[in-house]
C-alpha cells in the first residue's frame, strides 16, 4: 500500500512539473507582429539574437527618443542586435493613421529599425507580447518608450522606463554583454 501511495504521489508531482515547465518555456521569439507596412513578422526569425523591444508613440514628450533608438540601431547595425518599436496609442499619444506614424518615424527621425503597426500594450486589449511579458516577468509599460531587452534565448534580461534614454550606459552595457 505504501508503495502505491509513493507511486501516485510521484506521478502527480511529475504531471504538475511537466505542466509548469511547459507554461514557462515561452520566449519573445514565440510571438509575431504586423509591421508598419502591414507585413507579418514572425519573431522566431530573430532567434539567437538579442532584441530590444520599445513601445513608442509619435505625440509624446519622449518621442525624440526615436533619434536615440536610431543612433543605437546604427551603432549596433553590424552586430546581432534587433530593435523593434511597437507603436501604441495605449497612452493616447499616437496617431491613428499608419501613414502619419510613418511620416514621424521616417521623415523626422530616419528610423531604419523595425516598427510595428499600432498595438495596445496594456490591459485586456494588450498585444500577446505585452501580456506575456506581464505574465512571465510582472513587467508592463507604465508609459511610452519603455524598453525591454531580451537575450539570445528570448528571455527578458532587463527593462527600463521612459526616463532612461536609449544611449544610457545602463542599456548599452547590457547590450554589449549580449552581443
Where are these regions (language model features)?
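Short, internal strand/loop/helix patches
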Residues: 99-144
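Amphipathic alpha-helical repeat scaffolds
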Residues: 35, 55-59
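Sec-dependent N-terminal signal peptides
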Residues: 7-16
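Positively charged n-region of N-terminal signal peptides that target proteins for export
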Residues: 1-6
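Conserved helix-turn-beta segment immediately C-terminal to the redox Cys motif
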Residues: 49-50, 59, 64-87, 106-109
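N-terminal "domain-start" segment that seeds a small globular fold
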Residues: 21-44
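Thiol-/selenol-based redox modules, centered on thioredoxin-like
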Residues: 131, 135-179
